[in-house]
Structures are given as structure tokens and as C-alpha cells.
């Protein structure tokens, strides 16, 4: 990123006429403005105000015209963000925020609804402008987020506006908090019996469809930090010692819990 900025500066100095040269402060301001387009401050404010116990108060947000305008302005900046200039944890956080933000936007556009399946093509057909490209929610998750980072914890962070997903965070993801928040969401996942439970005497594990071969088993197995044989062993770092030992043994039958597509609406 620093190299790219430096090259751009050289081009400006070498190719511009003397009276067209911009002062250093102007160039720095332009770079700062471009970075701000990718920043999630406005989305963070919205989440803190409208997320209640992991659910979104869509009805209240829909009625708040000023906040809706601010939200749309944030989404417009996301659409114009030059994602080639962000990387690492900032890149990770950007795509989680984009996914969650456009989920909320999709629900607001279709409000009132009770189930996201009421929106035709919500995940795989409807496109949103992100980083000057038109992408579906599935594109954001499976092309921009999971492959480059190979971190399956993303499945605990992206929330497709339903109760099957881990409750949405009440703050935006940033380069500074993404690691800690991902681990927090993983711990929330294993503590919810709707997502995960074990019957040690009965040698049985019940876990969300997220871990099934039909869904995202391959993402957990491909995670660069994972060393187990069964996808469910991915949860070992987030459970108590007895459960961790049981999962690591591999001596159990895995059953997958049906996904709850009901809207994650507060109230």
C-alpha cells in the first residue's frame, strides 16, 4: 500500500504541469479520504444502537430516517472502496462488515418479513455494489472472505439475518478487534445448544449444519490452524477440557441440527 501511494505521488510530480502540482497536504488528504471510504465507523454506530442481545431491531431502524440516510451513505462508501488498498486483518474485517451490512439492508428493503427465505435469491442472486464490483452475499463470503484468509471462524461472524447464524456482534469488525471478536463468537456458538451439544456417555455430538459435508465442512478442514480429522474438532479450543478430550477422541456419531431461517429480529 505504501509503495502504491509512493508511485502515485511520483506520477503526479513527473507528469503534471508545474501549475497543476498538488501540495503534499492535498495528496495526503485524498489518501485519507479513500481509506475512510472503507472504514466502518458509521456501521459501528448503527450496530451499537440497533443490535439488542444479538438481534437487529429492524422495525425501529426502518422508522429512523436520519439513521437510514447515514446507513445508505455508509453502503455507498463501501461500494466505492478500493479494496485493493486494504489487506490482512483490515481486509478480513471489511468483508465481514460488508456481508453483515448488506444483509441488514436486504431485510430493510423487504420489510416487514418473518423469514429471509421470503426474499427471492437473497443470498445467491441479489447483487450489491462492493469495492466497485457487483457481488451477491455468497460472492462476498465464498470469493472474497473465506478463500484468501482460510479462516473458518468467518462462519461465526457473517450473519445472514437468521436465527441459525451466531448472533450478530453489536459493533463493527476492525483490524484491531477482529481476532478477539472471532474467538468470542466461536465461544458463543458452542455455548448455545441450538448450535452445539454433546452426549459423552451416548457418544453423540449434535452440531450446526455449518459443519456438515453439504455445507461448510471443507472450510473447517482447510483452515490453516486446524489439525484435527473431523470438522467438529475445530471447536476443541472453545470448549471445556472434558468436552475437548471427547471431541479429540473421534469416538462419537455426529448429527447435524436443522438450520433456523427465522429472521433475527429484536422484539
Spans of model-derived segments:
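Sec-dependent signal peptide recognition
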Residues: 2-8
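C-terminal motif of bacterial Sec signal peptides marking the signal peptidase cleavage site
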Residues: 12-14
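Interaction/scaffold regions that mediate signaling and macromolecular assembly across diverse proteins
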Residues: 18-267
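Processing junctions and N-termini across compartments
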Residues: 9-10, 32
Amino acid at each position: 500500500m505504501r509503495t502504491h501511494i509512493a508511485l502515485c505521488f511520483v506520477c503526479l510530480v513527473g507528469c503534471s504541469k508545474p501549475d497543476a502540482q498538488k501540495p503534499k497536504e492535498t495528496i495526503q488528504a485524498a489518501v485519507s479520504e479513500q481509506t475512510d471510504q472503507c472504514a466502518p465507523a458509521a456501521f459501528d454506530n448503527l450496530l451499537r444502537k440497533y443490535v439488542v442481545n444479538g438481534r437487529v431491531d429492524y422495525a425501529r431502524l426502518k422508522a429512523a430516517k436520519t439513521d437510514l440516510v447515514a446507513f445508505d451513505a455508509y453502503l455507498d462508501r463501501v461500494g466505492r472502496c478500493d479494496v485493493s488498498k486494504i489487506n490482512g486483518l483490515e481486509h478480513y474485517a471489511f468483508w465481514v462488515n460488508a456481508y453483515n451490512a448488506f444483509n441488514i439492508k436486504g431485510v430493510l428493503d423487504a420489510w416487514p418479513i418473518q423469514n429471509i427465505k421470503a426474499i427471492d435469491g437473497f443470498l445467491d442472486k441479489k447483487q450489491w455494489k462492493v469495492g466497485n464490483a457487483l457481488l451477491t452475499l455468497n460472492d462476498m463470503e465464498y470469493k472474497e472472505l473465506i478463500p484468501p484468509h482460510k479462516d473458518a471462524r468467518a462462519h461465526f461472524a457473517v450473519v445472514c439475518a437468521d436465527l441459525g447464524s451466531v448472533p450478530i456482534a453489536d459493533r463493527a469488525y476492525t483490524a484491531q478487534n477482529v481476532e478477539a471478536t472471532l474467538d468470542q463468537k466461536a465461544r458463543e456458538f458452542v455455548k448455545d445448544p441450538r448450535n452445539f451439544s454433546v452426549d459423552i456417555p451416548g457418544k453423540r455430538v449434535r452440531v450446526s449444519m455449518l459443519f456438515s459435508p453439504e455445507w461448510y465442512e471443507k472450510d473447517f478442514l482447510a483452515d490453516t490452524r486446524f489439525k484435527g480429522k473431523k470438522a467438529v474438532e475445530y471447536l476443541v479450543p472453545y470448549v471445556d477440557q472434558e468436552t475437548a478430550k471427547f471431541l479429540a477422541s473421534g469416538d462419537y456419531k455426529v448429527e447435524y441440527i436443522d438450520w433456523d431461517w427465522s429472521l433475527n429480529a429484536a422484539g
